Structure formats: structure tokens, C-alpha cells
Amino acid sequence: MALPGVTKLLLLPGVRAQLLNTPVRLSHWATPGRCTKSCHAYLQKNLRFCTTRSFSSVSPAAESSEDTVLKWLLLLIPVATFSLGTWQVQRRSWKLKLIQEMEARVSGKPIPLTTDPMEIKELEYRPVKVRGHFDHSKELYILPRTLVDPEREAREAGQLASNTQSGAQVITPFYCSDLGITILVNRGFVPKKKVNPETRPKGQVSGEVELVGIVRLNETRKPFVPHNDPSRNLWHYKDLSAMAQVVGAEPILIDADRGSTVPGGPIGGQTRVTLRNEHMQYIVTWYGLCAATTYLWCKKFIRKVAL
């Protein structure tokens, strides 16, 4: 006679082995009527012990091994975030030093412009002086651009809204009489309504002039920045080779300083001497994650508190 709930349990190896090794008195099975009740009670008692022993027989060594692996794997998180935070500290120090060097170069004494391409590369952000005259008939326009005004930016620092206006930077061929070559000069910023040179005739300087400018190098097109369109005289980034080819000049560019500004003309001094420096934010982020994950790791594996 099959007993309810017994058949399946008897199939378990641990239960079957336990029953085979358990002595049973024959008197319990002698009487047919008594056999069923006695057998049922006996099996329930012994099966409860066997199943408990069977299901609780997971190796403690296996559990300990799994916990150890998990423990050291999770420890990699605070270690990695601490390393990234330290790396950002080093990057910030390097960036601050680079900014200081750039500011020192810009504030240096103007030197004569050289025509050697290798020397030009070493002169980026260095002020140079040139003498010659402009060819306003071949102006190029880099747009859209906003006015670089350090004083206004300092006043509006921290404000949600600013009075920045959109416009363009005017690139004009400049024949250097002392060098015998034509270079490119970024005369400065004009608002959008003044891009057309006919709207600013007083600002079109004629005759030989002497000016000071900052040497600038070629720009690389950034993601999402439109391509230049030389046929329409639309430039979105400084491609010196293409610009020089269009106007017949050398691929040398200087940004005229603010002292070169004339009434009605472009506003000079549009060199922004700054570099993106967000390393402090990254430092706080990585070290914050390191502190949080270290706390959770110690709570879990040192203090043995369930998370």
C-alpha cells in the first residue's frame, strides 16, 4: 500500500540510504492492521530527520569558497575607483600647469614673426608683431562665434542668463611688407548684422599698419560641427591650409589683439586662453564612489551585516 507523501521522499538518495541503515523491529510489521499506521508514523518520524539532514548537507567549504571569491571581486570596485580618482588628481595638476604656461606665453613680450613652419609650431599663443596692409576684398568669416570679453564674463559669472551676442570672426589676408609674404589675420568679432563689409566701411583700415597678434595653429573639426563650405565662404573651424589656398596666402594665422581694434571695425582680442578643466568634478565623483563602496564592502564582509 502506497503511503501519501512517502514515495517521492523515498527516491531521495540520502533518505533511502538512511532508511536502509536504520534497524526496524519486526513487531511493528507483524500485524497487518497495525502495520499501516505504525509504518506511516515511523516513516514520518525518520523521514523528517533524513530530509532535514539531506537538504542541510551543503558543504560549508563550498560556501566559504564562493564567499571568498565574491569578497575579493567586489573589493576591486573601491580599488578601481580610488585609482581613477588619483589619476584625475594627476591630470588636474598637469592641466593647471598647462594653463599657467599658456597664460605666461600670451602675456609675453611680442617678438618678430618667423616664416619657418617648424618655428611657427613652437610659437602657438606667443604674441608677434607684423607690419603691412590688409586686403579687405578677400575676407573670410568663421561663424557662428560669440564675443570674447573677459571683463563682461567676469561680471556675469554665476548668472543663469548672459548677454552674449552671436556673430562671426573676420579673417583678412595681410601682406607683411617686412617679410614679403601674405598671412591670415583674425581681425576680431563682428555681430551678425555687421558681417557684410559694406555695413562697416569705417572699420576697413587702409594703408600700412603695424599690429600685434597671437599665433594660432590649425583646428580639428569637432564632432557635430558642420563642414566648411569654401564656395559660400562659410567656415565653422580654422582650416589654415584651405583658407590660405582660397585667398592665396601662407597657412599662418594670428589673432589681432584688442589694441588693434578701430572704431566701426571688428573687435580684436578674440583669443580665449583657457582649457576645459573639469577634473575636480571627476575627483569628487571617483573618490565619493570609492568611499561608498568601501563602506558597503566592510559592512558586508568585515562586520558581517546583511545588506
Curated annotation (Swiss-Prot):
- BP terms from Gene Ontology: mitochondrial cytochrome c oxidase assembly
Q: Taking the first listed entry, what is the main subcellular location of this protein, grouped into a coarse class?
A: mitochondrion
Asked if Transferase is a keyword of the record, the answer is: no
- Coiled coil regions in record: none
The answer, when asked if S-adenosyl-L-methionine is one of the entry's keywords, is no
Compartments annotated for it: namely:
Mitochondrion inner membrane
Record-linked Pfam families: SURF1 (PF02104)
Entry's transmembrane regions: 69-87, 282-302
Q: Provide GO CC annotations from the record.
A: mitochondrial inner membrane
Entry similarity comment: Belongs to the SURF1 family.
PANTHER family, sorted: SURFEIT LOCUS PROTEIN (PTHR23427), SURFEIT LOCUS PROTEIN 1 (PTHR23427:SF2)
What biological function has been recorded for the protein in this entry? May play a role in mitochondrial respiratory chain complex IV assembly. Probably involved in the biogenesis of the COX complex.
Can you name this protein? Surfeit locus protein 1
| Species this protein is from | Xenopus tropicalis
